[in-house]
Amino acid sequence: MIIGKGTWLDKVAYHVIQREKEVGRSLSLVRVESGLGASGIPHLGSFSDVARAYGVKMALEVQGVKSELISFSDDMDGLRKVPQGFPDWLNQHTPKPESSIKGPYGCHNHYGCPIGALLIDASDKGEINDKHSLGSEG
């Protein structure tokens, strides 16, 4: 592992630790968050956001700070456009919150769920240890 050997991840973690100390916050647990807009299908860029955040989490731990990564899928965002390959009837639901639109294929509670499930699957396959959260969960 190269984390702990002066990578940019180590530098980011160092600056986070210093900032938290300067503002007087506890270092008992530092949360790192990665976000995904649930409008479209996750892609390499979406996964790289989660992977970079996980790298910062790991660098914090190498520097002795307990941390956790929360992957947040904002299913309260409005549906901006219907991704290619999705049913045309979804066009009548722009710009409603994704959590208020029924699942396009009947296998999830609402539109944002299958998108979030794809991100969870990608992070699991990438062996990224994170907690998952949807905006509609509060």
Stretches found by the model and what they are:
Residues 1-138:
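N-terminal Rossmann-like or analogous alpha/beta NTP/dinucleotide-binding catalytic cores
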